[in-house]
From Swiss-Prot:
Its main location: membrane. This is Uncharacterized protein RP472. InterPro entries: HemY_N (IPR010817), TPR-like_helical_dom_sf (IPR011990). It is a multi-pass membrane protein.
Length: 334
């Protein structure tokens, strides 16, 4: 209702406006060559405005035609960028759900645009984690080293890759960079530990293993134990028996030991009493029971086989470790 009223008022205003203009309008004579055109001032103004608008439309149309190739190029470029972005997201999704081969295929086949900007980092990430050879991985991770989002992940992986290539100095540098960004990443600590061991930087090695002990990474205990045994043997070769004993005691305090390390420690440290050796062995057996420790227990103590059996099996679960208990009985001939 209101709109209808507004339209009526508008038409009335136009009618009275034109009537008013016509009342005061004056004649105008336009001379063009030998012709005299008689018109009114109002009509002349209207025709002038129409001519101006027509010229503007024609000029605008010509500009559009001239810019048409560039407009088409921009349109297709945007379409390609959107396609590439979609492909990056799709490749990333495939990688997350474990389809690494499909993610790699999408990344290599569909993505080539340099205009992806932020998405280029995700592109390089997919290419880095799915590349098959070490050099390609290193190349892609190097591109991510300046990315705030991926700098830690790139540094951590570059450390591993350079370690695999036996470039321990470079591996150490990248592992330290990753460590400065995140001190609690156990995988990076393990890489750093390996680097220090290969470079014989034992004080730094011990600092890292002290941190690793807090993570209870049982799968790496044998390797760490071997490193401590290696340090001790090197010290013995250099006639530094006291240092060797000190390293072995550090390993035992951190629960990094096996039967070989314990036997080497017992033979090296003649100040240990039988009770001290027994206590260490019982703790080692509680953490990682093995027949080799039973053998070592029998070797260093004067207890009977029955007493050894009772001492050691009391820390075992009779149901869970039933087979192992039977193996101990067989070894001790009980």
């Amino acid at each position: 209702m209101f709109r209808l009223l507004l339209i009526c008022i508008t038409f009335l205003a136009l009618y009275f406006g034109f009537t008013f203009i016509k009342h005061f309008d004056s004649k105008v004579v336009i001379s063009l060559y030998d012709y005299n055109i008689e018109t009114t001032l109002f009509l002349s103004v209207i025709l002038g405005l129409l001519l101006l608008v027509s010229c503007f439309i024609i000029i605008r149309f010509l500009i559009i035609i001239i810019d048409l190739p560039a407009t088409i190029h921009i349109m297709f470029s945007k379409r390609k960028i959107n396609h590439d972005r979609h492909a990056v997201i799709l490749a990333f999704a495939e990688y997350i759900i474990g389809n690494k081969m499909k993610a790699a295929s999408i990344a290599r086949k569909n993505l080539s645009s340099e205009d992806l900007k932020d998405f280029q980092e995700f592109h390089n990430f997919i290419l880095a984690v799915t590349a098959e050879d070490i050099d390609s991985k290193i190349s892609y991770f190097q591109k991510l080293i300046t990315s705030k989002t991926f700098v830690f992940y790139a540094s951590k992986n570059l450390a591993k890759l350079y370690y695999d290539k036996s470039l321990y100095d470079k591996a150490e540098n990248y592992a330290i960079k990753a460590y400065n960004l995140n001190e609690l990443d156990s995988d990076n600590l393990i890489t750093l530990m390996h680097c220090y061991a290969k470079l014989s930087l034992w004080s730094k090695f011990i600092f890292i293993t002290n941190k690793l002990a807090k993570f209870h990474k049982h799968e790496f205990v044998p390797k760490i134990t071997q490193y401590y045994l290696l340090i001790a043997k090197q010290e013995v070769e250099n006639n530094n028996t006291a240092n060797a004993i000190d390293y072995l005691e550090k390993a035992i305090d951190l629960n990094f030991y096996n039967d070989e390390l314990l036997e080497f420690y017992f033979n090296l440290n003649d100040k240990l009493s039988v009770n001290q050796k027994t206590k260490i062995l019982k703790e080692a057996f509680r953490i990682a029971p093995s027949l080799r420790l039973v053998q070592l227990f029998k070797k260093i103590t004067s207890l009977s086989d029955k007493q050894i059996y009772e001492e050691l099996t009391q820390v075992l679960d009779t149901q869970k470790d039933k087979i192992f208990i039977l193996a101990i009985e067989a070894y001790l001939e009980l």
